[in-house]
């Protein structure tokens, strides 16, 4: 099951029980880093977790997010072509 990540903007309404990605950046060593936030806590002062992903030829690795509050078995993957972050629920 694919869940398109929602980007937070200054005017965006924060919805309870929803997952958001606030920032995606290229970290040291060429790794992609995504910082995920949850619902009403989705502010810069309430970071849920940050996870670096290896820059692989396969278009990015899946990264488990054990600390995210939205759902058990939630993963995200970064699309190397567009930089879009997508959520996947583990089967």
What are these regions (language model features)?
Residues 1-91:
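Surface-exposed, low-hydrophobicity beta-strand/loop segments enriched in small/polar/acidic residues
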């Amino acid at each position: 099951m694919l869940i398109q990540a929602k980007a937070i903007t200054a005017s965006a309404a924060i919805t309870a029980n929803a997952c958001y990605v606030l920032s995606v950046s290229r970290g040291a060593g060429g790794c992609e880093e995504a910082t995920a936030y949850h619902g009403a806590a989705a502010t810069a002062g309430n970071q849920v977790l940050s996870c670096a992903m290896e820059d692989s030829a396969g278009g990015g690795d899946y990264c488990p997010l054990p600390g995210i509050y939205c759902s058990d078995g939630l993963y995200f993957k970064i699309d190397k072509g567009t930089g879009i972050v997508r959520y996947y629920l583990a089967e």
